[in-house]
From Swiss-Prot:
Protein name as it appears in the record: Class E basic helix-loop-helix protein 22
PROSITE patterns: BHLH (PS50888)
Expression across tissues: Kidney, lung, brain and pancreas (insulinoma).
Record organism: Mesocricetus auratus
Superkingdom of source: Eukaryota
Gene that specifies this protein: BHLHE22
Protein's cellular compartments: Nucleus
Residue segments, region Disordered: 34-93, 134-156, 188-225
Pfam families per record: HLH (PF00010)
Length: 365
């Protein structure tokens, strides 16, 4: 019974293996037929063996297909056989092929997605590599710089460009065939991601626009710098003129000018100059008063008859002690003068001090 079970298990395993091989062969044939069935207006060629990648770029997680001709009209397709497909429908059977993760071409579309059924048959898609970053890539991606606004999800975009006519047009129409240009938008690839020609042109236009904006901003910054330099030069000249004027003011102010004395500050110089000006004004006022008093005394002495001698005698008569002091002090006038005038005349002579003199005159009999 155990032998029967083993035989049954062996038969079942052989049936499964035969079924797996037949399914793999049919799937490979269907893929080969689908890839080799050339649609109108498209020329497809088989992919050459994949190039050896350098060790530095062997860990690239994404592979893209390169055009077969310089114009990019054809597509490089992987060999029909694969070492084991991923994504629920990959082709298997041959050990020499390279697997494309997640690629499934069937009646429902590419990769089992009905939304992609509108793509022409045999169009190459760069699918998300998923988590298998260590697997070998199918082909090198086209050269070019990576656009700064690419998505970082590692997907590749398929750009279909029509050459001015319907893709289903006759192959004889010049330039009427559909050109499929691939663009890989993988943020992990720093220099190997391909860009469509339009993308490169757009980025070039944006760069030129940015260059124009940078030129205008640099011009504005230069103008602002020149204006700031002019303002600084004007302020520097103004401060130099102010310092020179203050030095001249310190030179005329009477204070101790010596190396041991600290130089006056600007505020101290101005305060000292103000006080000096006020002092000079007060001295001038005192001088004016003195000059006015002297002029008034000269007019009084010229108008009096006995002149100053009579005034001295009158003062001696009124104040004997003062007269004796003046004589002892060597008063230049002699005492032997004519008698003094009457009291009203004295009051008229000394009108400035008539308050006490006239009072004495009025009190006399």
């Amino acid at each position: 019974m155990e032998r029967g079970l083993h035989l049954g298990a062996a038969a079942a395993s052989e049936d499964d293996l035969f079924l797996h091989k037949s399914l793999g062969a049919s799937t490979a044939k269907r893929l080969e037929a689908a890839f080799r069935s050339t649609p109108p207006g498209m020329d497809l060629s088989l992919a050459p063996p994949p190039r050896e990648r350098p060790a530095s770029s062997s860990s690239s997680p994404l592979g893209c297909f390169e055009p077969a001709d310089p114009e990019g009209a054809g597509l490089l397709l992987p060999p029909p056989g694969g070492g084991g497909g991923a994504g629920g429908g990959g082709g298997g059977g041959g050990g020499g092929g390279v697997s494309v993760p997640g690629l499934l071409v069937g009646s429902a579309g590419v990769g089992g997605d009905p939304n992609l059924s509108s793509l022409p048959a045999g169009a190459a898609l760069c699918l998300k590599y998923g988590e298998s970053a260590g697997r070998g890539s199918v082909a090198e991606s086209s050269g070019g710089e990576q656009s700064p606004d690419d998505d970082s999800d590692g997907r590749c975009e398929l750009v279909l460009r029509a050459g001015g006519a319907d893709p289903r047009a006759s192959p004889g129409a010049g330039g009427g065939g559909t050109k499929v240009v691939e663009g890989c938008s993988n943020a992990h690839l720093h220099g190997g991601a391909g860009l469509p020609p339009g993308g490169s042109t757009g980025s070039g236009g944006g760069g030129s626009g940015g260059g124009g904006g940078g030129g205008s901003s640099s011009k504005k910054s230069k103008e602002q710098k020149a204006l700031r330099l002019n303002i600084n030069a004007r302020e520097r000249r103004r401060m130099h003129d102010l310092n020179d004027a203050l030095d001249e003011l310190r030179a005329v102010i009477p204070y101790a000018h010596s190396p041991s004395v600290r130089k006056l500050s600007k505020i101290a110089t101005l305060l000292l100059a103000k006080n000096y000006i006020l002092m000079q004004a007060q001295a001038l006022e005192e001088m004016r008063r003195l000059v006015a008093y002297l002029n008034q005394g000269q007019a009084i002495s010229a108008a009096s008859l006995p002149s100053s001698a009579a005034a001295a005698a009158a003062a001696a008569a009124l104040h004997p002690a003062l007269g004796a002091y003046e004589q002892a002090a060597g008063y230049p006038f002699s005492a032997g003068l004519p008698p003094a005038a009457s009291c009203p005349e004295k009051c008229a002579l000394f009108n400035s001090v008539s308050s006490s003199l006239c009072k004495q005159c009025t009190e006399k009999p």
